[in-house]
Amino acid sequence: MLHKTSRFWPDELAGFKKGLGDIAHHDFLTLETLSTRFMRVGKEPPLRGTVIMLGARNYLLFTMGYVPYFRLYPGQRIPRPLEIVEHHGHSTAQEVCREILALTKLNWNSCAFGSSLPITIRFARHVGKILTEMPVGVTPQTKYKFYM
């Protein structure tokens, strides 16, 4: 599974598929945080894990929201859903959403229950911020441990 926050160019998508070689099962996703907020009847926001199908390969996923097990919403504002804008691959929407939800809880540098973005996007943004502060001419470290 490959996550991006920008749309796939046709040549880029072809390159990723070519790079797969013999790997048959793949999913390439474009994820965007939607600015629209949704409400549900009652006083709690939508449930974490709620999926709204917009099309066969386009859907909304609430990665933040009310968690019945804890009987609370671990956030401060009305949650915004994550929109799966593009989905190129073999998995069902349910499988993709389940995996994204799991990846929102995979930040070992935080004690939070989960985050709005999967670690694949969140960590890439974190490293990107660090790299923008590097002086010109310095070769960046390639090992993960330098960015924890």
Can you annotate each of these PLM segments?
Residues 1-148:
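Long, contiguous domain-sized segments
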